[in-house]
Amino acid sequence: MSGELVFVPLGGVGEIGMNVYLYGIDDQWIMVDLGLTFADDRLPGADLVLPDLSFIEERRDRLLGIIITHAHEDHIGAVPYLWSKLGVPIHCTRFPAAVLRRKLSENGVQQASAIREMTPGEPFDLGPFRCCLMHVTHSIPDANALAIDTPFGRVLHTGDWKLDPAPMVGERTDIEGLESFGRDGVLALVADSTNVMSPGTSGSEAEVRDSLKSLIREQKGCVVLTTFASNIARLETAMLAGHEAGRSVVVVGRSMHRMIDAAKESGFLENMPPVLDERDVGQTPREKLMYLVTGSQGEPRAALMRIAFGNHPRIRLEPGDTAIFSSKIIPGNERTLYNLHNQLVERGVEVITEEDHFVHVSGHPCRDEIEQMYRWMRPKIAVPVHGEVRHLYAHARLAERLGVDTAPVIRNGDMLRLAPGPVSVTGEVTTGRLVLETTELVDAGDDLYRTRRRLMSHGTIQIVLVLDSFGSLLTSPRITPVGAVELDTFTENADEITERISDAIEELSDREVLDDDRVELTVRTGLRQAMGLPKFKRPIIDVQIIRLSPDALDAGADKKKGAA
């Protein structure tokens, strides 16, 4: 035995989303998950946000493989965009493999052969790491915890999990396997923190199935139900509920079709009733229709957003219809979703969420389930992941109350030594966020996004100056504010503002007026003063200086004479 066993999160710590974790021994590495997250108001105009893999890209020849715990976007979504930077085998079970093959193909990545399909419970070796995927229940089929044997001891990486005694799709959590792995205690438990602040248990999908069937039977008009496209059990529940209520079920949204196809390929959804294509609805009465649509988080291009705003080519909602949100609001999406709810209500649609009716159970463990996992594993070290900072600290406090020796709360980029010796952060590696702009990856800290945020908050003012070769103004400055000031107020004072800018330029010396930088600074300062902009108002001021030579002026004059 030599070296150290270290754990390095590149994403997924201090946040919910973008999970990507590294385990290393002697500079040999395995990666667990490679997910993305979705942009918020801090990245205007952006959609997908991916992790910066610079640290491991520089060591790609020492990266032994990627292990995927399950097929949620925050765990696999970055693979189609970043796998080519790594080029190593991807190890996962059947359903994640089916989803990944489709995602890689859709993104033009012809490397599906890189996927190694693993069987839960069967160990495989990657250098000094003996790995075994162990089935756990989650809100998606074929989810797994990762059991890792190392020369320094055992580590259990839980992934996303819960204890559901009656899962509707897929198998129960492999309690026997977990108990066996933790029988002698483990070195470290790296565990899901999402619901650590919620007492009790997370509930069973079977209970939601009964509730949704009853709810859909009661509805009179057209029903639109949205949920996470990857929640295969919920999709099956919704389809069965609609079918039993005498409704034709219509599936709308590319990601939902992709997930259903992958589930069928993997042997799930055997009880799925027949569904209609949205183009084949024909003369089916509205009260006999149920649309199963994407967009449970208010995604701008998803089906529900287009339906709510009347932009969908085939689906229209009317007063008396019902929209059921069979999902939880992901933190950060509240404002977008409330706006979506309001838009639906304005159309006369009844909106039903988990606050109104029992339509959702979480796919993550609540406190009682987390405590049970600690009893099975009896870890020396607890490393909280998959949660915001408040979740991580609550998880660490819980672990300490349960007798764990140490429960460090770390940040993305921290290199945490797990063994040998005392647990400590021994260094920090490069982390960050990349934004997918069309087909290009842009650093989230780029000026592009600072400029967009400033434009959103403060607007812009464009000034065009036309000067002759001596620096004299040939025309009055043309000033165009966009979103920076109230337009009527500006119009009332435009002549005075223009005059003050002209005066400021004329006060420059003969030498200064020939220096574009000096002219631009003078105009910026003068404009702020002339418009009375407060210090906190910082519009982007774009000064365009056009200098015309005598030849250009003569040519312009000749052209005017010719036209006359």
For each of these PLM feature ranges, what is it?
Residues 104, 399, 531:
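Conserved hydrophobic residues forming the short capping helix/wall of the S-adenosyl-L-methionine
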Residues 197-326, 330-355, 359-512, 520-521, ...:
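Hard-cation-handling environments
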Residues 1-67, 72-283, 302-316, 335-338:
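His/Asp/Glu-rich metal-coordinating catalytic cores
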Residues 89, 383, 542-543:
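Short glycine-rich phosphate-binding loop at a beta-alpha junction
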Residues 7, 30-31, 157, 249, ...:
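Short, well-ordered strand-loop elements centered on a beta-strand within folded domains, enriched
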Residues 512-549:
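C-terminal tails and terminal domains of large nucleic-acid-associated
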Residues 1-6, 486, 516, 520:
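RNA-binding accessory domains that recognize and position tRNA/RNA substrates
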Residues 13, 37-41, 45, 62-63, ...:
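A glycine- and charged-residue-rich anion-binding loop/surface
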